[in-house]
């Protein structure tokens, strides 16, 4: 007899005997309380009959509970003995040969597929996060760190403006209560300017910021690149512009010396020196006399040194003449010889 047929016959014999034993056990368990009730009914002793019936029912229930609990404990103890990484593919675990063969073939195939799928064929780019370097186009330079959260960066920029008054990390803004990001951008880069490029970029910057912050959708990589590019543009504008320059269209034509500025800084810096009108046309290559400087040193001899220029106008006419027709203009970078000849030191004891 082949081994396979013997295994089949042995399996069927085991199952048949097991089924017969279970049937007899269930039958006797059912007959026992019924027989006890019948025997007690025929007896004349009521107390004994009650004890027999109740005892039979309690014994049946107790035996059933013991069998069920014992079965559960036995199964769990058997499961604990099996290692967690153990695969039931042996003949004892899975007697069917075809099933074992199919499992082994699929396991080998899954191993090959895991190697193929380890690196995706197409770049996987999730909105809101900077993809890793392997997903970038090798022809372009890596712009941001891997897995950078775009929304967190933009939120950090707005939080610094809201709580610290710092705009684009280089400008301290005295914000008023109720001002928003759009109000700050408009006040700084849209008003008092006629630069069309700057105005258009300001509007794009505001629209892009509001779309990113309040659209409810994840920030795409292109949106974040555009936002960073505009932020860098406005940083350069804020670093290179002159806040003291007059605003176009706001000049006060009624006066040639007073300008109407928003911040009022130049109004306080107007020189009070009384130069003639033609003196401004000479440029900055000429030296105008300054006030006399005194150098005083106190010691045992009480020596006082006074530093005076070699030529000092004695009256307003000579001062005006020197300003209009200077004889020896002084350069901004005088030589050592010129410096030595330009000053005299008079010592008084």
Swiss-Prot record:
Residue ranges that the UniProt entry lists as topological domain Cytoplasmic: 1-18, 71-349
GO cellular component, one term: membrane
Keyword presence, Chaperone: no
Keywords: Membrane, Transmembrane, Transmembrane helix
Extracellular side: 40-49
Membrane-protein topology: Multi-pass membrane protein
Main location class: membrane
Domain of life (superkingdom): Eukaryota
Protein localization: Membrane
Residue ranges that the Swiss-Prot or TrEMBL entry lists as coiled coil: none
Transmembrane stretches, start-end: 19-39, 50-70
Ranges for region Disordered: 312-333
Keyword Membrane: yes
Family: Belongs to the DLT1 family.
Role according to the record: Required for growth under high-pressure and low-temperature conditions.
Name of the protein in question: Defect at low temperature protein 1
Originating species: Zygosaccharomyces rouxii (strain ATCC 2623 / CBS 732 / NBRC 1130 / NCYC 568 / NRRL Y-229)
Source taxonomy: Eukaryota, Fungi, Dikarya, Ascomycota, Saccharomycotina
